[in-house]
C-alpha cells in the first residue's frame, strides 16, 4: 500500500501490485532484492505467506488478503467494506515463476501462516462480512 497526497483533498491509500525476491548471501545483514513479475497485477492487502513443500518442492505460498486496503474494522480507507480473497498464489523459487493453485477459504487480516504435519493453516484473521475469527483454518494447496 502506498499513500497519495493531494493539495485539495484527503490523502488516499493506494494498492501497489509489486513483488520482490530477496537473496541472502554470505552476509546475513544484506539482502539483494529484485523485482519479479506480479502474478495478477492486482495487489492484496494483509495476506500472509509461508515457505512450504508443495508436491515435494520448496514453494512460497501466499493466501488471502483483500483487494481493498482497510482499517482495523475491515472497512476500507475509502469507506467501502472489504471482503477476503480466496486466491492462493504459489511462487517456485527454483523455477522463478508463479504457479496456479486452487482457491481456498477466503480470509483476510492475516499476520502469518503456520505449517502442521505438512498442511498450511491460517490462525485468526477476518472472514466474510468483516467477522473477526479465532479459528485455525486449513488451506489445502493444490496446484492446477
Residue map of PLM features:
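Kelch-like beta-propeller repeat domains
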Residues: 1-144
Amino acid at each position: 500500500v502506498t499513500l497519495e497526497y493531494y493539495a485539495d483533498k484527503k490523502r488516499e491509500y493506494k494498492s501497489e501490485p509489486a513483488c520482490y525476491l530477496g537473496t541472502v548471501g554470505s552476509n546475513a545483514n544484506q539482502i539483494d532484492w529484485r523485482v519479479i513479475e506480479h502474478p495478477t497485477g492486482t495487489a492484496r492487502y494483509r495476506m500472509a505467506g509461508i515457505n512450504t513443500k508443495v508436491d515435494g518442492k520448496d514453494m512460497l505460498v501466499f493466501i488471502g488478503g483483500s483487494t481493498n486496503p482497510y482499517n482495523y474494522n475491515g472497512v476500507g480507507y475509502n469507506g467501502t467494506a472489504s471482503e477476503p480473497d480466496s486466491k492462493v498464489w504459489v511462487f517456485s523459487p527454483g523455477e522463478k515463476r508463479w504457479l496456479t493453485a486452487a482457491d481456498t477459504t477466503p480470509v483476510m487480516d492475516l499476520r502469518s501462516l503456520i505449517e502442521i504435519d505438512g498442511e498450511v493453516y491460517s490462525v485468526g484473521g477476518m472472514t466474510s462480512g468483516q467477522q473477526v475469527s479465532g479459528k485455525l483454518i486449513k488451506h489445502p494447496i493444490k496446484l492446477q
